[in-house]
Amino acid sequence: MAKNIQAIRGMNDYLPADTVIWQRIETILKRVLAGYGYSEIRTPIVEQTPLFRRAIGEVTDVVEKEMYTFDDRNGESVTLRPENTAGCVRAGIEHGLLYNQEQRVWYLGPMFRYERPQKGRYRQFYQLGAEVFGLQGPDIDAELILLTARWWRELGIFEHVTLELNSIGSLAARANYREALVAFLEQHQDKLDEDCKRRMYSNPLRVLDSKNPEVQQLLNDAPELCDYLDAESKEHFDGLCALLDGAGIKYRINQRLVRGLDYYNRTVFEWVTTALGAQGTVCAGGRYDGLVEQLGGRPTPAVGFAMGMERLILLVQEINPAFVAERTVADVYLASFGEGSQQAALILAEQVRDTLPQLRLMMNHGGGNFKKQLGRADKQGAKIALILGEDEVRSGQVAIKDLRTGEQQTLPQSEIAARLVELLS
């Protein structure tokens, strides 16, 4: 007997019972995005490897350890996208969308990182992100945060997430801070783990988000980035905080929040939760005003965020189980039995779909008695059953049963659509 082939570790199948929940959540996310004026963009899953090396940074964990990179048949190095901000910027430059223009886009799709699989962290994961190009004020940063806050309210998780904010300033400000931080770390090398020692010179800001408790204790005495901010970055951050205060959005300033990708500047933010254990970040983003120029475009201010869909769905399931409890596949189930009923049922089903194109109507196939077919209707979550037997076929009628109340009546087929609207409204 042949050995079963299974999914690659860390890459998951999402079955119909799962995708019902995904679709319900995605519908809310997309509706809110449309309400803020965002349009969808779709970019390739595979990009040239230099795109990510230049955008994310050569000495980041993503580039050094986590990318799925290989040579294609022409010997060109290509990479499965580990994130999609770089792809959106590349597409914007390539198609002339960014110069002297304002763009608001969103994307949703699979990303790939070679990480140790665990709850909420996978090697193939779905990410929804939003990017804004051409706007540089703190007001657009605030709007992005307000957009995400609206998601949390609609999903019933707002009270279980916390907004963390920081400003990492300009490139020059970070260079000055980096020099001070390295000098501090050099004095305390004996208290650093090997990973932090490696990062101390290559990417010292990443030491700030070390998960090592001893390192975190040491950092209590380290220089703080806020003391090195340039005047414009400080004004921008103060403006953002004032806007959020005015909008009633609570936040916590986290001086050690730096984000793991090199392209960020000024505003960085994360929505975090304690409800999922170690994997606490739900959504994260910030400004990346230099990235467009870095990838070959003209200087263009930009800001955005990304959110892991699997982690969001885990959080909604944990906090708001009622939201994901309903798994209705069909509104109406068409049961048929007896001679001639199958053909009549096919015709009736198409007529109803023509009249009510938004209706979810599932037709019984495979026979079965009346009781068994109604059992299938219940399993699919149907509220109404249409019953078509030999008598109904001969008379041109249909029995319609409200599965919630048990009430049943027989009507001419021409009146069925109107009655369904009444019962389901």
UniProtKB/Swiss-Prot annotation:
It is found in: Cytoplasm. It comes from the Bacteria. GO terms for molecular function: ATP binding; histidine-tRNA ligase activity. Coiled coil: none annotated. GO terms for biological process: histidyl-tRNA aminoacylation. Gene3D superfamilies: Anticodon-binding domain, Bira Bifunctional Protein, Domain 2. Homodimer. This is Histidine--tRNA ligase. It comes from Photorhabdus laumondii subsp. laumondii (strain DSM 15139 / CIP 105565 / TT01) (Photorhabdus luminescens subsp. laumondii). The lineage of its organism: Bacteria, Pseudomonadati, Pseudomonadota, Gammaproteobacteria, Enterobacterales. The gene is hisS.
